[in-house]
């Protein structure tokens, strides 16, 4: 219970928080995407369309940031977005929830980063952030802002020019547009609103989560087998006790009823202890990495509880029935 809950609910928590940050962070009226990449001049063309107040292209990629110190130092992957336009234009279509500094100075040699990365790298506004661009090039831009919605949007935000020459594909993947009409923007790519874009991203995240769920299922299955074997051996070791109960007048139904209550007690204690261990692990972990509490889907947690109770009941009842046959 503890192991499976920790693995599964860690992912559901991250997905739930990321989805919430994405929905709250995109303030654009329209989101234009294209799996093959948007036209090079997509942002310029969109900005010239009637009614458009701001159009910002995003080049999404990954960078590496050194975190820790001494023997505990390592390179941490961070989602990065290269912004076409100024920080002021970005603020019109994306709310990064800036905690320190300002996006107004965002530009060549200057970046904004998520607060979790700032804590991990022990840097703040005014410091230099050492990082490795996608092609391995080292850079040390100045941090001009620290924000809070990096999990749902991007951990590192920098100007597009700083990334364009260091990625395998220099085409923007997303275009955020404030104002204008979706019909006119359709010439640039697939147009949707914030809700539709967030739903699509959430679906992609759920499809990618199956590897985590599979690992949790396999490891949880091994733990369940060990627990079931323990319960089965415990019941078989009590064959004389069960026989004595039958000899003193207890009916087969009464003995099985007693064992069912015992299995219910064992499963309840296991669920409570497992939940407590998972909570003790998840709460500080999620608070430290996201600043929010873990998200536990009620139906998923209920299925874990039902599975624990069902396994305990079967592991006790089936061997008990076999042991009681000789006393029938």
Model-found features: residue ranges?
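Short helix-loop junctions at transmembrane helix boundaries
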Residues: 269-310, 317-328
């Amino acid at each position: 219970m503890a192991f499976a809950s920790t693995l599964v609910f860690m992912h559901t928590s991250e997905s739930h928080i990321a989805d919430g940050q994405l929905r709250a962070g995109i303030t654009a009226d329209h989101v234009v995407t294209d799996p093959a990449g948007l036209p090079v001049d997509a942002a310029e063309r969109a900005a010239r369309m009637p009614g458009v107040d701001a159009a910002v292209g995003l080049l999404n990629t990954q960078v590496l940031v050194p975190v820790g110190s001494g023997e505990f130092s390592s390179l941490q992957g961070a989602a990065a977005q290269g912004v076409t336009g100024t920080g002021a234009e970005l603020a019109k279509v994306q709310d990064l929830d800036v905690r320190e500094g300002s996006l107004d100075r965002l530009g060549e040699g200057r970046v904004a980063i998520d607060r979790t990365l700032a804590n991990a790298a022990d840097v703040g506004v005014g410091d230099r952030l050492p990082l490795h661009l996608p092609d391995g090039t080292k850079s040390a831009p100045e941090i001009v802002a620290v924000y809070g919605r990096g999990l749902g949007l991007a951990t590192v935000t920098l100007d597009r020019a700083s990334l364009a020459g260091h990625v395998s594909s220099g085409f923007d993947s997303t275009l955020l547009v404030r104002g204008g009409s979706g019909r006119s923007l359709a010439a640039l790519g697939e147009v949707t609103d914030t809700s539709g874009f967030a739903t699509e991203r959430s679906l992609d995240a759920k499809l990618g989560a199956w590897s985590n769920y599979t690992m949790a299922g396999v490891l949880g299955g091994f733990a369940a087998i060990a627990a079931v074997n323990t319960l089965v051996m415990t019941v078989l070791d009590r064959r004389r006790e069960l026989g004595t109960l039958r000899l003193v007048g207890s009916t087969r139904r009464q003995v099985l009823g007693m064992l069912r209550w015992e299995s219910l007690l064992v499963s309840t204690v296991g669920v409570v202890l497992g939940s407590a261990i998972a909570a003790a692990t998840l709460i500080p972990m999620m608070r430290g990495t996201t600043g929010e509490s873990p998200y536990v889907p009620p139906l998923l947690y209920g299925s874990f509880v039902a599975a624990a109770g069902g396994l305990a009941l079967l592991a006790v009842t089936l061997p008990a029935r076999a042991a009681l046959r000789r006393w029938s």
